[in-house]
Amino acid sequence: MKFKKFDVLIVGTGISGIYSALNLDSSLKILMLSKRELTLCNSALAQGGVAAVMDKEHDSYDLHIKDTLIAGQYKNNLDNVRILVEQGPAEVLKLQEKYGVEFDLKDDGSIALTLEGGHSRRRIAHHKDSTGFEIETNLIKQVQELKNVTVINNSVLCRLERDNRVFFADVLTGNCEGGTPEHEYYCADSVILATGGIGRVYDFTTNSAIATGDGIQLAYNLGAEIKNLSYVQFHPTAFADKENRECFLISEAVRGEGAYLLNCHKQRFMHKYEPERLELAPRDVVSKCMMEEQKATGSDEFWLDISYKDPEFIRNRFPMIYNKVLEKGYDMTKEPIPIYPCQ
């Protein structure tokens, strides 16, 4: 059994995995494994944007940290929150200036910022309603130019073992759509597990097909401590389509731009549960409020309504969502759209 040697093995090719490869020393020999093709990942499905303090005249690190701790019910790792908040603005500018990400801009050329749940200030940098795809595709272009990085598509890491300071990987490669896969073997000094979420363990999910929690199992088998598995996020506004397992996400940014949540009677209800934050409470809170309202009304019917806004604004700000729900028979410039919480 021959093992091909690399310095670093990165499992997963979403934004986390690719950004890691781009920021490692160029002298390192890097192998990246993608379960399917590079753009089939949760990162490419992300719509809303990137939270960072880009407008220091109206925002601050302390406010962002406070919002994050409140949304995390103070269970956050404060050191990690500080790193995220304080390094965030520079990384957003790096995405824009170094990697070519085209964030939406204001008339003065600065990055346009929107509002999302749990945030007390506008701090979400975005590219219309397909921010993840914009970032992912630009990072892919960059990593494909690196001579020290090898990317293998259609590859599944079956087993990962460690002997002293070396990791050994058994990788199933080949056509995942019916071809003849083969086992290939690699070893590396370091491993980065960037395998994404666990959405596919649920009947209905907005996650990509590759999100099956592989990284958790791989890390556990190596002896890593696994924490907080009960903290699974359910997004309150997926398009309500119980005929399809793959649910389409309606970005939180739609509520950030003023959309209302309505119950089965087409009435707003968030004021009963969150009188201050209303529709812009954190996702887990909004989802819980919807469950309480379902108990109160006896109906699982919910709607999201932004139709009172200017139609041209809606079509320009949310072109992907607008066209997607139009295919489903709803014109969000004229009527509410059906939604329900989903992983």
Locate the predicted segments by residue.
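Flavin (primarily FAD) binding-site architecture
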Residues: L193-T206
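Glycine-rich active-site loop/strand segments that organize a redox cofactor
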Residues: A52-L84
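Residue-level detector of alpha-helix initiation sites
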Residues: I10, G14-I15, E37, G197-G199, ...
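An anion/pyrophosphate-binding glycine-rich loop and adjacent beta-alpha core
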Residues: L218, A224-P341
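N-terminal Rossmann-like FAD-binding beta1-loop-alpha1 element of flavoenzymes
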Residues: V8-M32
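Glycine-rich FAD pyrophosphate-binding loop
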Residues: D25-Q47, E57
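Conserved redox-cofactor binding core of oxidoreductases
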Residues: K98-E182, C187-S190, A194, A238-D241, ...
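Short beta-strand to alpha-helix junction loop
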Residues: L78-P89, R123-K141, I152, T205-G213, ...
